UniProtKB/Swiss-Prot annotation:
Protein name (record): Citrate/succinate antiporter
Membrane topology term: Multi-pass membrane protein
Cellular component terms per the entry's GO annotation: plasma membrane
Subcellular localization: Cell inner membrane
Function statement: Responsible for the uptake of citrate in exchange with the efflux of succinate, fumarate or tartrate. Has a relatively broad specificity for C(4)-dicarboxylates and tricarboxylates.
Native organism taxonomy: Bacteria, Pseudomonadati, Pseudomonadota, Gammaproteobacteria, Enterobacterales
Organism superkingdom: Bacteria
Primary site of residence: membrane
Organism name: Escherichia coli (strain K12)
Gene field: citT
Family: Belongs to the SLC13A/DASS transporter (TC 2.A.47) family. DIT1 subfamily.
Keywords: Antiport, Cell inner membrane, Cell membrane, Membrane, Transmembrane, Transmembrane helix, Transport
GO molecular function: antiporter activity
Stretches that traverse the bilayer: 11-31, 60-80, 95-115, 138-158, 190-210, 214-234, 237-257, 288-308, 309-329, 345-365, 379-399, 401-421, 424-444, 463-483
Length: 487
């Protein structure tokens, strides 16, 4: 009975939040539809945190509400007054746009890669190898995950392809070796910690190198066009290096303290892993085929970006896995995590886009410029960086966030006399990768990691908030002073 009451409370909370926001007068200068849309968006976030029903269902319902209520949530009076404007047709087109997102399908491809590792047995083999040599202590496994991701980052300009398509499929095979399973109390034995370490690794590696994540390059384009400032690959790396090294050392250990796994040492498991490797014998045809596809995909992701899109590489890999009988189609149709994540990310991308479509982002930029009048240059830098960073709670993609918010923040900073624009620009672009730890939907790998079921929603949000604050604090308190000395 108590469980039912608790679930009813969780179900009502988002509706109450939305209702209260609807009753609050629209802020000065904000389009009415933007405020009403923002109310639905906030209610969706509350629902995804409390999870009275699955998070994917929450985001799906939110998109449906916005499509049906588009006259009050998306479109302004001028659009609606145009006889040639078909509101319902445009709303439905908007609502389904997320399913054509390249990021969404790249994430889906990464999930199928993970399935390939599982079905072929290659993932289990690599996992056993890691456990044999580094599995005596859980903490060393955590550091191994971070190091592997960072070593791949300079050559893989997509964190979803790198962490989601290369690292995750391997690490996903480790927890079951320790009797730790998803969506089960045993997830905390070791699975939850290892999955969170991938969140740590992808956020650090994405900020360490310009080529660590696609939105980094997009950010540099905006910096060049709007601020007229050029940032080189080496300059980026050296600016983040002091912060990155410190976080690389402390983040796995701090995760171990804050989200401590039940299994910390296991000499027996390391010995057992060696025996299991002997039992598995030589690599099978399926495993060799998958290795070839992995190397092909990595090669195209690293060297073929000018010829073939990263998402197309992922779809090519899936097609070849099907054609070469690495993964049967029936297994893909039964792979609930992949389809669930596809719908979840597609709907979140749409909802984030709606903030711009409704006029909320434009109002936000204008209001922020007004409120920053009279601030000192350094205070302005801090405020702009923090606003840009924590605004990522509103976005389901680093690329979408960068494309939407970075031009706004740069324009605001450029318009205020005395602001050190080079320092501001570098701090803004360096923060793009590390903000990927904030929420389960913050970046492609995060969606994949959360979708596998080892880290509960409340734990993800709690850890994301803690590490999000630590990351940005280190960037401002350590990275900025060093950057100021160099300049």
């Amino acid at each position: 009975m108590s469980l039912a009451k608790d679930n009813i409370w969780k179900l009502l909370a988002p509706l109450v939040v939305m209702g209260v926001m609807f009753l609050i007068p629209v802020p000065d200068g904000m389009p009415p539809q933007a405020w009403h849309y923002f109310a639905v968006f906030v209610a969706m976030i509350v629902g995804m945190i409390l999870e009275p029903i699955p998070a994917t269902a929450i985001s799906f319902i939110a998109v449906t509400i916005c499509v049906i209520g588009s006259n009050y949530l998306l479109f302004d009076a001028k659009e609606l007054a145009d006889p040639a404007f078909n509101a319902q047709k445009q709303a439905l087109k908007w609502g389904l746009a997320g399913f054509s997102s390249t990021t969404v399908w790249l994430v889906f491809g990464a999930f199928i890669f993970a399935l390939g590792y599982e079905v072929s047995g290659l993932g289990r083999r690599i996992a056993l190898f890691l456990v044999k040599f580094m599995g005596k202590r859980t903490l060393t496994l955590g550091y191994a995950i971070v190091i592997i991701d960072i070593l791949l980052a300079p050559f893989t300009p997509s964190n979803t392809a790198r962490t989601g398509g290369t690292v995750f499929p391997v690490i996903k095979n480790l927890p079951p070796l320790f009797k730790s399973f998803p969506n089960d109390p045993s997830a905390r034995r070791i699975g939850g910690y290892l999955m969170w370490m991938m969140v740590i690794s992808t956020s650090l590696s994405s900020s360490m190198f310009v080529t660590g994540a696609a939105p980094n390059v997009l950010g540099l384009e905006f910096v060049s066009k709007i601020a007229g400032i050029q940032i080189s690959w080496l300059q980026w790396f050296l600016c983040f290096l002091p912060v990155g090294v410190i976080l690389l050392i402390i983040a796995p250990w701090l995760s171990y303290v804050l989200y401590k796994p039940e299994i910390t040492h296991s000499e027996e498991v390391a010995t057992w892993a060696g025996d299991e490797l002997k039992t598995m014998g030589a690599l099978t045809r399926r495993e060799w085929t998958l290795i070839g596809l992995v190397l092909l995909s990595l090669g195209l992701w690293v060297f073929g970006s000018e010829v073939i899109n990263a998402t197309a590489v992922g779809l090519l890999a899936v097609s070849l896995m099907l054609a070469l009988h690495v993964v049967p189609w029936k297994d893909i149709t039964r792979y609930n995590s992949a389809w669930n994540t596809l719908v979840n990310l597609a709907t979140l991308v749409v909802m984030a886009n709606g903030l711009t479509r409704s006029g909320f982002i434009d109002w936000f930029a204008g209001t922020m410029s007004t409120h920053l009048e009279g601030f000192s240059p350094n205070a302005t830098v801090i405020v702009l960086v923090l606003v840009f960073y924590f605004a990522h709670y509103l976005f389901a993609s680093l690329s979408a966030h960068t494309a939407t918010m970075l031009p706004v923040i740069l324009a605001v900073g450029k318009g205020i006399p005395g602001v050190p624009m080079e320092q501001l620009c570098i701090l803004l672009v360096l923060s793009i990768g590390i903000m990927g730890c904030l929420t389960p939907y913050a970046t492609g790998p995060g969606v994949i990691i959360y979708g596998c079921g080892y880290v509960k929603s409340k734990d993800y949000w709690r850890l994301g908030a803690i590490f999000g604050v630590i990351y940005i604090s280190m960037l401002l308190l350590v990275g900025w002073p060093i950057l100021a000395m160099w300049n």
